[in-house]
């Protein structure tokens, strides 16, 4: 009976394409390509893609990458069995542009688009499925975790101008999932108006759409510095020790 309910639920869920942002410059890694760094003998990007491959809610994967990495990433997808990857496309001049280019290549069947940082290799299929399920209900959803440190606003010279209430702050993660037409319109608007956005939720918020947050995962960190890679290795080792 439980299996039957699962099949019915699967049949009714919307088609979801994951858009993987993998065209960054890795400037904070000292020129090293973060996505091709090995994490327990597997490239960071491949760990991210494997989680999307295993997530029941993801039907298709489109990757936006640097032009010089297109062939390598396509080859790695075949090597690691990323069968959901339909296309690897050239990224744009900014993250926003890259995600839009990937979105335009998504299947016409896609009702939801899930934007995933390529450099979040510890994201889990469980979290991915939870965010997609939330977005299917409300149209725009993302994972986030409470901010632990005290945050200060400062001037360009470093003078403190304020201390936001930490209880109202959240650190955003990915995947960030949206109705397909909504995300494409939001990204197009941000680009046309030359408005810098640091995540896809920001672009959607500009259009007046409410984005709902669900509990994220503290282990779902983004690899942007060598220290992040060291922490990720420790988390992965602990995960493997638990299994």
Feature annotation, model-predicted:
Residues 122-214, 243:
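Conserved core of the sugar-phosphate nucleotidyltransferase
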Residues 18-20, 63, 115, 140-143:
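Structural beta-sheet core signal
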Residues 71-76:
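Acidic helix N-cap motif at the loop->helix transition within catalytic regions
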Residues 97-112:
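Active-site nucleotide-sugar/metal-binding loop of Leloir-type enzymes
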Residues 1-19, 23, 54, 199-201, ...:
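SAM-dependent methyltransferases
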Residues 2, 7-70:
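N-terminal glycine-rich phosphate-binding loop and ensuing alpha1 helix
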